[in-house]
Structures are given as structure tokens and as C-alpha cells.
């Protein structure tokens, strides 16, 4: 019985971590070229903007996929000729980085939203655990009273009968 509250907390914590909602606030673009290391953050408000310059090494165009949530088409362009020469296109699903040209691109989560979701779930788990603990305690107390009551009901008549028998034998 002592392990039940701990087990409930564990289950709810796992549930909170796996079901927390993550809001993606932008994109992190990192150069995969060891000779030219570079990493920039692009806000989600720049989605649809053509030719986002990545440290002078190339350009990226990010476009939302119609009807999809957290899914984007990423076009990589060469740095010259006003971004007309495409170096390839990939569809990016948030949480799974893609490589376009020499760039690795991933969605950047909004840590605040994730933390808030986890905190809320953890609080709910704590309240549920407290309620469960209270219920278990109440049930235990009720059981104790019931046992005591039953015990009294059996012991008292038996004592009276024994007393009467002894008095009869004595007479």
C-alpha cells in the first residue's frame, strides 16, 4: 500500500512529459560545413520570407505546408544570383532536423510553453496523488473502525456466556 502513491506520481510524471504540448517559435539553422561553422535562429514570423541569409554562406526559404501543423518546405539556395539557383528542397517536420545543402535545419521549441504544460500536468498529478492518498487513508481508517466494531461484537457476548457458565459451575 505504501508504494501506491509513488507509483501514481511516476505514471503521471511520464504522462506529463510525453503529452506536453510544444509550441515551435522558430527555426535553428546550423552549418554542416566544418570549415565554416555557423548557427542562427530564425523567428517563425519569417516563414515565407525569401532568401534568409545564413551568415553569408547561403540562403534559406521557409514556407509553411498548407493544411499541416509544424510542417514546412525548406528550400536551400546558393548565395549568388539572387537566390535563383535552388540547392534542393526538403520537407521539415518539427522535431526531425533536415539537411539542405550545407545547412541542418530544425524547429526551435518555445521552452516556456513546454515548461508550462509540464508544470500544469505535474500539478494535476500532485493533486490527484493527494486525493488518492486521502482516499487510501480514509479507507484504512474505515477498515480499522470496522474491524474494531466487529471484534467488539464478537468478544463481548462470548465473555458474558463464559461468565455465566462459570457461575453455573460454581453453584
Swiss-Prot record:
Keyword Signal: yes
Residues linked to a lipid group, GPI-like-anchor amidated glycine type: 149
TM spans (from-to): none
Signal sequence bounds: 1-20
Residue positions assigned to the propeptide: 150-171
A cellular-component GO term for this protein: plasma membrane
PTM text: The GPI-like-anchor contains a phosphoceramide group, rather than a phosphatidyl group.
Keyword 4Fe-4S attached: no
Superkingdom, taxonomy of origin: Eukaryota
Membrane association type: Lipid-anchor; GPI-anchor
Subcellular location(s) of the protein: Cell membrane
Keywords annotated in UniProt: Cell membrane, Glycoprotein, GPI-anchor, Lipoprotein, Membrane, Signal
Family to which this protein belongs: Belongs to the ponticulin family.
Protein name (Swiss-Prot/TrEMBL): Ponticulin-like protein F
Protein species of origin: Dictyostelium discoideum (Social amoeba)
Gene: ponF
Amino acid at each position: 500500500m505504501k508504494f501506491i502513491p509513488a507509483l501514481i506520481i511516476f505514471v503521471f510524471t511520464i504522462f506529463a512529459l510525453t503529452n506536453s504540448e510544444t509550441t515551435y517559435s522558430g527555426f535553428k539553422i546550423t552549418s554542416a560545413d566544418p570549415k565554416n561553422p555557423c548557427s542562427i535562429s530564425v523567428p517563425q514570423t519569417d516563414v515565407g520570407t525569401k532568401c534568409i541569409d545564413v551568415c553569408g554562406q547561403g540562403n534559406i526559404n521557409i514556407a509553411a505546408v498548407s493544411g499541416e501543423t509544424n510542417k514546412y518546405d525548406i528550400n536551400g539556395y546558393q548565395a549568388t544570383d539572387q537566390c535563383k539557383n535552388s540547392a534542393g528542397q526538403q520537407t521539415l517536420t518539427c522535431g526531425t532536423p533536415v539537411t539542405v545543402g550545407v545547412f541542418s535545419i530544425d524547429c526551435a521549441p518555445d521552452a516556456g510553453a513546454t515548461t508550462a504544460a509540464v508544470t500544469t500536468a505535474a500539478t494535476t498529478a500532485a493533486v490527484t496523488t493527494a486525493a488518492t492518498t486521502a482516499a487510501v487513508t480514509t479507507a484504512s481508517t474505515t477498515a480499522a473502525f470496522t474491524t474494531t466494531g466487529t471484534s467488539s461484537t464478537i468478544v463481548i457476548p462470548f465473555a458474558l456466556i463464559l461468565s455465566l457458565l462459570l457461575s453455573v459451575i460454581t453453584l
